[in-house]
Amino acid sequence: MKPQNILYIMSDEHNSKMLGCYGHSHVKTPNLDKLAAQGTRFTSAYTNSSICIPARAAFATGRYTHETKYWDNAMPYDGEVKGWGHRLIDEGMRVESIGKLHYRAEDLPTGFSKQAIPMHVMGGLGQIWGSIRDPLPDERPSRMLNEIGPGESNYNRYDRDIADKACSWLQDASDITDDQPWVLYLGFVAPHFPLVVPQEYYDMYPIEDLPPRMLDPEKGYVRHPWLQRMDDFQQVDRHLTEEQKLMGVAAYFGLCTYVDAQIGRVLDALAATGLDANTRVVYTSDHGDNVGKRGMWGKSNLYEEGAAVPLIIAGDGVPAGKVCQTPVSLLDSYQTILDCVGVEPNEEEQTLPGASWFDIANADDDDERVVFAEYHAASSPSGAFMIRKGRYKFIYYIGYESELYDLVADPEESTNIAADPANAGIMAEYEQYLRDICDPEATDRDAKDMQNALIAKHGGREKAIHIGPKAATPVPGQAEE
């Protein structure tokens, strides 16, 4: 594949099904739909941990959370574990970012030669309260949905600023005659809460026309005990009126369209400058969002709504209009980016578990590829681990019963078939895939030991519960509201 630039676009918390090109009945994403028509769309793409910081550390390093030890939103990526950005800087390449990274601090060597308006964790600390899991406190009602509906948030303005700066960056880059490829990473914050969106986007989704809620506990759905314990701690949905729940969905849909519009501006600038001829484009998200399904909001689980992400790649050498069903994950970004810019992986990089999305897109679907995710962060009573291979997804919990879903017969994961004796062989096979990657019990203990040490460092549980943002991370220059 010919070396080219790469424009890597990552949104925040975009549910993998909520794009037009993924067949959603309501959500409008015309710019991403166009990108998918020009390139390859992946239907089985996953985060490696369904919360911001661990997911972004996997993206940066090509390594699993249990390997890097960036367990939760209080342990942000600091560059100690080197990633693809470090490698490309060593090769003399231009590697720059605009927008949300959610690392520890701008002045740390995290693999970017320059950062524009970066969002990092507040005060270099993050959500210390989220490390309190052993045991999980009885409750800590979340403020994630304190704001819902039409309006103008700091996040909306921030995304416009990111698009503005990206368009200017591309214009400047088009004037450079150097043939060496560059990497530009864009980190948008939509559709992450606050669920506030400009009126014109909110009005696209009248609440009386919204699709019905899926797997509603108020209508008979019974949550898995691990998820129920999480909800008892967060207490989000139970404090919303029926109208607020609908408004939250409408606002989330609107944010999907809003971020699509900002991405469209950037893609138009890429074409207007002529850089589209030698630039490949990636679009994905750091994790998903429940958007009310199972009576949950935010992310933090390993169901499709929390762990699956949209993934579209386009450009020279990428099959146009293809739909790829091979399971992939964010840690594949390492090999994907090196592949795009023409850097051969060194001996250590060849041992990483990922593979280039460009190679995968050009191959037949691989039902044998195993994708792994894990969760050890805020609101979870114990570690959770996911294996996706072929038609099945296996979720293993420490201290709770496992789950098995047939994603072909049951794409909404409504029926756990783990206890069916006919599936005993599948259960054993998938648990072995998990144990080939890590020892889940030892990993759970390792995560909690490090989290308990962090809590002790900050004065114990009673003090730590109050340290860190209670909702969304503030944008650059903004104090927590």
Q: What does each model-identified segment do?
A:
Residues 408:
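Residues forming the ATP-binding cleft of Hanks-type serine/threonine protein kinase domains
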Residues 436-438, 446:
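Non-catalytic connector elements of ABC transporters
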Residues 1-397, 402, 411-432, 439, ...:
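Formylglycine-dependent sulfatase
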Residues 443-461:
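Short, charged, surface-exposed hinge/linker loops at domain edges
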